[in-house]
């Protein structure tokens, strides 16, 4: 199978998000923010996968841009979980770093596809 960096990274990140969700629900009894980060954090890879299998360039562009927006939303939920004390510094820094890397990759993809109109 051909390597696709964004698919690989977003899937690995989604698996970490699932573990974070389980931890937050089981250990911290937190159900609201955890559901939000589960939805957005797993949606990144789902949209990237759909984009990778798109039938048209327009569909590819749309799916990758949605993945980009979901990654930015996930970054926000990570910040809230950290600042509210639900996740420790080490967990936050590792996941935040991975999230920022995914955002940069998706920003580059969407910038190239949109002719530089993205951030």
Predicted segments with their positions:
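Short, C-terminally biased terminal segments at protein or domain edges
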Residues: 1-46, 50-119
């Amino acid at each position: 199978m051909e390597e696709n960096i964004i698919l690989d990274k977003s899937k690995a990140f989604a698996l970490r998000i699932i573990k974070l969700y389980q931890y937050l629900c089981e250990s911290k009894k937190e159900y609201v923010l955890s559901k939000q980060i589960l939805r957005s954090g797993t949606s990144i890879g789902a949209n990237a996968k759909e984009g990778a299998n798109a039938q048209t360039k327009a569909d590819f562009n749309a799916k990758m841009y949605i993945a980009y927006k979901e990654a930015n939303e996930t970054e926000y939920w990570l910040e809230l979980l950290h600042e509210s004390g639900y996740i420790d510094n080490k967990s936050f820094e590792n996941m935040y770093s991975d999230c920022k890397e995914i955002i940069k990759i998706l920003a580059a993809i969407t910038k190239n596809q949109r002719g530089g109109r993205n951030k």
